[in-house]
Amino acid sequence: MLKSQFQQKKMTRNYTGAWQKTPGRLLGIFLIRFYQITLSSLIGNQCRHAPTCSEYIYEAIARHGLWAGAWMGLFRIMRCGPFGTDGFDPVPPSLGHSCCFYKPWRYWKISDKHNK
């Protein structure tokens, strides 16, 4: 029998799809994982969304890079407050043509369009 038949996939709460391992993405992923392992375990799950904010930022950075992912994550955290949104809020698979690095406020609009 093949060894691969008996291997189980490692279960993780973070994005498991393929992503380019650039220095910026690796730095962002490292910081998010550091938060998840240290502070998040002490604080507990306080997020009102699924996936949680740290999982969302992890996936946003992995899919869209450090700059776009960090802005999307910041706007997600701003939406997660007591008077913000809740429920299922996934990372959009693509950003669209209106998003560019010198207009970071447009990353807020991506999440709004994706949720509707």
From Swiss-Prot:
GO terms for cellular component: plasma membrane. It is found in: Cell inner membrane. Pfam families: YidD. Keywords: Cell inner membrane, Cell membrane, Membrane. SMART domains: Haemolytic. It is a peripheral membrane protein. Transmembrane segments: none annotated. Its main location: membrane. It comes from the Bacteria. HAMAP family: UPF0161_YidD (MF_00386). Belongs to the UPF0161 family. Could be involved in insertion of integral membrane proteins into the membrane. This is Putative membrane protein insertion efficiency factor. It comes from Bartonella tribocorum (strain CIP 105476 / IBS 506).
